[in-house]
From Swiss-Prot:
PANTHER family named in the record: URONATE ISOMERASE
EC number(s) reported in the record: 5.3.1.12
Gene this protein is translated from: uxaC
Keywords: Isomerase
Entry protein name: Uronate isomerase
The species this protein was found in: Lachnospira eligens (strain ATCC 27750 / DSM 3376 / VPI C15-48 / C15-B4)
Amino acid sequence: MKQFMDKDFLLSTPTAQHLFHDYAAKMPILDYHCHINPREIAEDRKFENITQVWLGGDHYKWRQMRTNGVDEKYITGDASDREKFQKWAETLEMAIGNPLYHWSHLELQRYFGYNGILNGDTAEEVWNLCNAKLQEDSMSVRNLIKQSNVTLICTTDDPVDSLEWHQVLKDDKTFDVQVLPAWRPDKAMNIEKPEYLDYLETLSNVSGIKVNSFASLIDALKNRMDFFASMGCSVSDHALEYVMYKPYTEEEIEAIFAKRFSGSAITTEEMNKFKTAFMVSVGKEYNKRNWVMQIHYGTIRDNNRFRYDQLGPDTGFDCINTYDCSAEMAQFLNALNATDELPKTIIYSLNPSVNAAIGTVIGCFQDSKAVGKIQQGSAWWFNDHKVGMTNQMTSLANLSLLGNFIGMLTDSRSFLSYTRHEYFRRIMCELIGGWVENGEYPADEKALKKIVEGISYNNAVRYFGFDL
């Protein structure tokens, strides 16, 4: 029997072990999509206890605690941090096969030097050990980032954000990890939302451009893109329930905008036309600026209305949308490509059943402007586990060039989650090592080194064009 999560965790063959320990493990981390707060980096926050780090905003964990019958008081409520940690430790015992089990223990091993097992019985021991360790200067946010060998972080930022904390970090020569904004304009696109008109007013004030038409909306966003670019931004991100494409005319879009601007509701057809026009318009701007466009789709959000009204969004009540919008996705990419204005694009679906569909769509729009110009993103959210990652990479290998894959991102709100890159790299090396051991790929050291180091880090550096 193998030891629990030892140095060869998830690595079952000599080749997999060699590829991980000699190549993948040594590579830095480029975290090109996450949800961490730049203010906490700028202020070099130190956490008082492990609950603040682990349970402060992690809806992955909250979801499983609810599944274990834990009262909301101990999840997002007013229970003490020690009580919340106890409930999480008791929940973790039941999480056999869940990536949270592995992530939690990787974090305990790497950051706290704890190689034991966290459960209800050991919770007090782990609580005391972690909290004592968190008081050390080495466990401040900046030092956690540095010891994780992170070279660059892209946060997630709304067009109206001031980016003041990015500026603080930009001016601080004592911290050499780049922390760059990433453009997330969902609120400017979501015309159906009740708060949309209030958002337009904020955008008008921040941009200095009165937004009272679709054309002026795009002008205001271009103004903010210029500001974001001045702060080092070269990455956008869009969260879509599905990728839509509905043919439209400029006159139709202006009429739809005017209808909504007057306070009237719009139809689903009108919403999809508007969002199509929005995505095409900003996509062209990304291409002009050589920005990368990320599209995350396949989510049905905030399904539990009772809890949403209590807790708000991003609290653990989202699910997979199984609608296959591959045809619309191809039409959308084609609309940009037809005028030679398709930017580098990364496509992530929360629905794992469309891995092959994405793999074939991206093959339709590659060109010589960039290696792997259109990428399938790493297994995301409900799929970033061993099976999900293995299936995504296997599908990508079957249909595209896995060697050009840009690899992993944390998509996290936690400063301990960089171990997810290690987790991914172990799974990737196990997959590739298995192919080599089975005679499906040669034991070509030079080629394997290039592929493993590329997927781990180098491909992303080249793809995004960051100065590293």
